[in-house]
Curated annotation (Swiss-Prot):
Catalytic activity: an acyl phosphate + H2O = a carboxylate + phosphate + H(+)
Top-level lineage group: Bacteria
UniProt entry keywords in alphabetical sequence: Hydrolase
InterPro entries: Acylphosphatase (IPR020456), Acylphosphatase-like_dom (IPR001792), Acylphosphatase-like_dom_sf (IPR036046), Acylphosphatase_CS (IPR017968)
Protein family: Belongs to the acylphosphatase family.
SUPFAM superfamilies: Acylphosphatase/BLUF domain-like (SSF54975)
Species of origin: Rhodopseudomonas palustris (strain BisA53)
Pfam families: Acylphosphatase (PF00708)
EC code: 3.6.1.7
Protein name per the record: Acylphosphatase
Domain called Acylphosphatase-like: residue spans: 2-94
Length: 96
């Protein structure tokens, strides 16, 4: 299962990307996370359906300093995994 997830609210400047990277690594997911200039955080998760769904649930909560006002997720194409850094299962990417 591959899902593209976008979180909106107080999600930048609160450790959200580090939280996502830590949790996704713990769930053995592949993918990436990045800030967007519009103030949202975007992440791609690839792995077993139960692990991806667990990660999406964690994103709804976020780290303690965050407030997720909205979360959208959609099916993603495997080509989007290519955005991560070579040799990494899960990457934090630059802002777009």
């Amino acid at each position: 299962m591959i899902r593209l997830v976008t979180m909106r609210g107080r999600v930048q400047g609160v450790g959200f990307r580090a939280f996502v990277e830590f949790q996704a690594t713990g769930l053995d997911l592949e993918g990436w996370v990045r800030n967007r200039r519009d103030g949202s955080v975007e992440a791609l998760f690839s792995g077993p359906a139960d692990a991806v769904e667990a990660m999406i649930a964690l994103c709804r909560q976020g780290p303690s300093a965050a407030h997720v006002a909205a979360l959208a997720d959609e099916e993603a194409h495997p080509d989007q995994l290519r955005l991560r850094r070579a040799g990494e299962r899960f990457s934090g990417l630059p802002t777009v």
